[in-house]
Curated annotation (Swiss-Prot):
Contains a C-terminal catalytic domain, and an N-terminal region which modulates catalytic activity. Residues 159-349 form the CheB-type methylesterase domain. The gene is cheB1. It is found in: Cytoplasm. One of its GO terms (biological process) is chemotaxis. This is Protein-glutamate methylesterase/protein-glutamine glutaminase 1. It comes from Anaeromyxobacter dehalogenans (strain 2CP-C). It comes from the Bacteria. The modification 4-aspartylphosphate is found at D53.
Length: 349
């Protein structure tokens, strides 16, 4: 049976365009002009995923999102204008349970949606596979050991040929909150970190700024030539590849170029460059996400002597990228998200 998608948008043009795009991909599509109509339709037939606008009459999308997550959680993809203040709203939606974001321009919407059909279908299909209970488990703190219990030993890692120099992280669907959990746990003197998160280009700068406010380390959108330093995390700009080179230290390279593994930025591009440049001094981490971007790169990192970690199935919103890496033998460790940060700290000691 085809996955059932509910498109909630007050624009008839958007509803029609998304219905055609998703319908051609074999998805069953229902539409609603606003959240109140959507709630009535959801009482009759529960969708597998919702595509949601934010600015609508009678009830805004964020209020509707909160109600959905509180009453009967359904994977939600936000499809809204993200430029300027909209990017902050989109971040808020992700924090409140949305699994991904699709950019929607203010003008030329129909043509833009048609041009972005492949990404839209990919994101919505991934949402139908999202497991919201896994997101709850990922964000839940680890239970405290009972009084008198022996402390859990630190992970025993293989001897490292070089010093702990660089952490590289890749993520996609569900990754924005996973990255927040990971980076918030980093101390101010954490090793240099480079991140690729699949997201629209107008979104990454605001995402990095939000993380910077929450974390003890500095977090910024990467610019070409930025130094990768202890206590700093660089986030790949949307629609640009991020790699690393050595020039009196580790330096970020931000570049154009064709998509790799169907993505720009590509996790594989970052991981392959880290394997060449930093090798055994690298820790590679592959978090939740759809598809297989990063799986080959994580395997190359492991072959170069790096320590490698994949997020486990129980805490992955979409167990795609980590699953592929595990299947290829790329992961030295498979860990629930709350234990990934402790693995970083154990490796860096």
């Amino acid at each position: 049976m085809a996955p059932r998608i509910l498109v909630v948008d007050d624009s008839a043009v958007v509803r029609m365009a998304l219905s055609q795009i998703l319908g051609r991909a074999g998805l069953e599509v229902e539409t609603a002009i606003d959240p109140l109509v959507a709630m009535d339709k959801m009482r009759r037939a529960r969708p597998d995923a919702i595509v949601l606008d934010i600015e609508m009459p009678r009830m805004d999308g964020l209020t509707f999102l909160d109600r959905v997550m509180a009453q009967d959680p359904v994977p939600v993809v936000v499809c809204s204008g993200l430029a300027g203040p909209g990017s902050e709203v989109a971040l808020h939606a992700l924090e409140h349970g949305a699994v991904d974001v699709i950019e929607k321009p203010r003008l030329g919407v129909k043509g833009f949606l048609e041009d972005s059909a492949r990404r839209i279908v990919e994101v919505v299909r991934a949402a139908t596979q999202a497991r919201l209970r896994a997101r709850v488990r990922a964000l839940r703190p680890l239970p405290r050991p009972p009084a008198g219990a022996q402390p859990r030993p630190a992970p025993r890692l293989a001897p490292r040929a070089g010093r702990a120099e660089l952490v590289v992280v890749g993520a996609s669907t569900g990754g924005t909150e996973a990255l927040r959990v990971l980076l918030e746990a980093m101390p101010a003197d954490a090793p240099a970190i480079a991140v690729v998160q699949h997201m629209p280009e107008v979104f990454t700068a605001q995402f990095a700024k939000r993380l910077d406010k929450l974390c003890r380390i500095e977090v910024k959108e990467a610019a070409d030539g930025d130094r990768l330093l202890p206590g700093r995390a660089l986030v790949a700009p949307g629609n640009r590849h991020l790699s690393v080179k050595r020039a009196g230290g580790l330096v970020a390279v931000v570049s154009d170029g064709p998509p790799v593994s169907l993505h720009r930025p590509s996790v594989n591009v970052l991981f392959h460059s880290a394997a060449r440049v930093a090798g055994p001094g690298t820790l590679g981490i592959l978090l939740t996400g759809m598809g297989d971007d990063g799986a080959d790169g994580l395997l190359e990192l492991r072959r170069a002597g790096a320590h490698t970690v994949a997020q486990d199935e129980s805490t992955s919103v979409v167990f795609g990228m980590p699953k592929e890496a595990i299947a290829r033998g790329a992961a030295v460790e498979v860990l629930p998200l709350p234990r990934v940060a402790s693995a970083v700290l154990a490796w860096a000691r």
